[in-house]
Structure formats: structure tokens, C-alpha cells
Amino acid sequence: MKKTLQYISIGLIFLISCQDKTGFSGFQNGDIIFQTSKSGQSRAIQIATGSNYSHMGIVYKQENEFFVYEAVQPVKLTPLNDWINRGKNAHYVVKRIKNSEKLLTPEALTKMKQVGEKYAGKDYDLYFEWSDSRIYCSELVWKIYKEAVGLEIGELEELSDFNLTNETVKQKLMERYGDNIPKEELVISPESMFNSDKLITIFEN
């Protein structure tokens, strides 16, 4: 009896400790996760786009562990707990496409991973160009869902649509582009995807 209670106690401690790392135990393949990055450009992205969040990725489960497929340097899979802890205050929001039980079939998820594979190892796109040679976080998620599932999550905008007058933003633009800011460049922002009516919020810690 004592041994049984000990095993139960150990099991409970293990479950609690696992949940404490993420704060959420209901992740599913294909979930989209958002956070505020602590990178040097994060504040500029937030101001320019009017967003609380500056980084995002797609959640996948592999061998009973969850990972985030993300565009950093380079594009790669990152263990979920590491990804969460890397964000500001370990805060994150999980969103899921509507009707995911119908749209995210095993075949669709396989296609998403296949599409994502062609970006694996590519450099992070500091210039936010709409090309496949380099790629940034929201562009990666948008293109995977577009090509694999046929969903356009969020509205494409031009760089000129954002708030480019703030001093923090202007400084970052000068660092990247000098006097040749590509104001007509197509961009998909984390904010646009976060507010898409194709997504529902599953969890926020």
C-alpha cells in the first residue's frame, strides 16, 4: 500500500512538473504559437505592426515530445519548453485553425511537414523579403498553411502600411535598408495572423 501511494505521489509530481513547464497540456499538431521575442528587433516589430507579439511558429509532436517549427537563424525545430522560455516572461498564446479536426487530417499534417522541410536550415530573413531564399517567422507559418492546407491566414500588407514614423522603427529600418526602404514589399505580420478570423484562441498563459 505504501509503495502504491509512493508511486502515485511520484506520478503526480511528474505530471505537475511537466505542466509547469508549459502551463498547458492540450497542444495539438498544427497549433500556431505566439510570443514576444527578446531579440533586438522585437520592439520595432511591435511598434510598426501595433502588435503585442513579435514571434511565432507551428507546433508539432514528434516521438511524444512537442516542438516549434520556427524561422530563427536558421529555420529549425525547437523543443517547446525551450521556445517558451526564450520568450519575454515565458508568456505565449496558442491559436488553432477553425475546423481543425476536419482540415488538419493526418495527410494534411504530413503535407505541412513536407512543405516546411524545404525551408529547413534556411537563413532568417532580416529584410522581410517575400521570397523563399530567406524567410521570417510569420512568412514561414503563412506559406506552410497556404501551400499545404490552402489557407491564407491573415492579410498580406505592404511595408508602407505599417507605422514607420516611430524613432525606434526608423532606426531599425536605417540599419537594414539605409535610404532604400522597399515600401512596396509584401509582408505578413504576426499581428495580422494573430487577429485572423480563421483562428481561435486555445490558451494564453
Q: At which residue positions do the language-model features occur?
A:
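Hydrophobic h-region of N-terminal signal peptides that target proteins for export
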Residues: 11-18
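Sec-dependent signal peptide recognition
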Residues: 2-10
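Cysteine-nucleophile amide-bond enzymes
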Residues: 18-205
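Generic cytosolic/nucleocytoplasmic N-terminal low-complexity/intrinsically disordered segments
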Residues: 1-2, 20
